[in-house]
A protein has these predicted regions:
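Intrinsically disordered, low-complexity, charged terminal extensions of DNA damage-control enzymes
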Residues: 1-19, 24-25, 188-325
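Catalytic cores of DNA base-excision repair glycosylases
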Residues: 2-197, 203-212, 216
Length: 325
């Protein structure tokens, strides 16, 4: 175990780390799980108001498990990566069924639940119990890859295995909760992706990337395939109430009805186009304004402009509607 690395990070965390985040007030595994899921691919400052609203509305596993999915999606709307919200709801239902409503802390139990991977399970257990658990989220990968210059000339699988081995060797036997938060905070606030603040880093003296001025070369970037694109023609209806129906791109949310090309071409008013990046897809959205049809499909729902501000709509659709109505 690299005790020196851990000791420096723990000391740094106590003095400079983020120690007053709302979820840190509790060691309840349900609370820490909710925070960890929200923090996936999302910045802390964005998560905080969503976390506060969720905990206020769903203070227990049972509250979230018994809530309608539409209400969960409505509270989540705007946070992105919507499969997280669906897994969130599904997860609490499983906890109710399999663990009698008591959120588990064993790694194997956590990893068996929807939306919880190996690193997330470790982060939850460490936060809830203070036990040493190696974690390897995106921030931690960046710290370790730079510190040990790990990844050059290796396959992604080889790199992942080495990073996990390094994470385990550096995890201390004591103060697991503080260390886990420290290594995540270091990656989020100091060892950042584009402009690392290496002069402020507590482990810069033995960071190989810092010593060779090669920080931005790590983690080694994967060769990515071109992002596929899809075109959506969407109808904006503005005679009175706004009409919505659920579509496949934002499952569980309300969005605008999709049109065929020939239907879109019949519109007299074309609205500004939008580009929106999903996880593995670029959507090119072409909205057009149309009168409400005489016969409204049963799957559609009418919203007022005020409802658009609060209902479960994808961020680009909400923004579009508030701009054009």
């Amino acid at each position: 175990m690299d005790s020196s690395f851990a000791e420096r990070l723990v000391a740094w965390q106590k003095k400079y780390g983020r120690n007053n985040l709302p979820w840190q007030k509790s060691h309840d595994p349900y609370v820490r799980w909710l925070a960890e899921i929200m923090l996936q691919q999302t910045q802390v400052k964005t998560v905080i108001p969503y976390f506060d609203r969720f905990i206020e509305r769903f203070p227990t596993v049972q509250d979230l498990a018994e809530a309608p999915e539409e209400e969960v999606m409505k509270l989540w709307a705007g946070l992105g990566y919507y499969s997280r919200a669906r897994n969130l709801h599904k997860c609490t239902k499983e906890v109710q069924c399999r663990f009698n409503g008591s959120f588990p802390i064993e790694l194997s139990d956590l990893e068996s639940l929807p939306g919880i991977g190996v690193s997330t399970a470790a982060a939850i257990r460490s936060a809830a119990t203070d036990e040493p658990c190696a974690i390897l989220d995106g921030n931690v990968k960046r710290v370790l890859a730079r510190h040990g210059m790990i990844g050059k000339g290796l396959t992604p699988r080889e790199t992942e295995n080495l990073l996990w081995a390094d994470a385990r060797s550096k995890t201390p036997l004591k103060e697991g909760r503080t260390y886990a938060q420290a290594v995540m905070d270091l990656g989020a606030t100091v060892c950042t992706r584009t402009k690392p603040l290496c002069a402020l880093c507590p482990v810069n003296q033995d960071c190989k990337a810092f010593q060779t001025d090669s920080q931005l070369e790590f983690p080694v970037k994967k060769v990515r395939a071109p992002v596929p694109e899809e075109i959506l023609n969407l109808a904006v209806y503005t005679d009175g109430n706004e009409v919505r129906k659920s579509e496949r791109y934002w499952k569980g949310l309300w969005t605008l009805p999709q049109l065929r090309d020939e239907e879109a071409e019949q519109s007299e008013e074309v609205l500004p186009a939008i580009e929106h990046r999903l996880t593995h897809l670029l959507l090119r959205i072409y909205p057009v304004r149309l009168p409400i049809p005489a016969k409204i499909p049963a799957a559609w729902k009418a919203f007022t402009k005020e409802q658009i501000k609060t209902e479960a709509l994808p961020t680009p659709i909400r923004k579009l509607l508030l701009e054009v109505l």
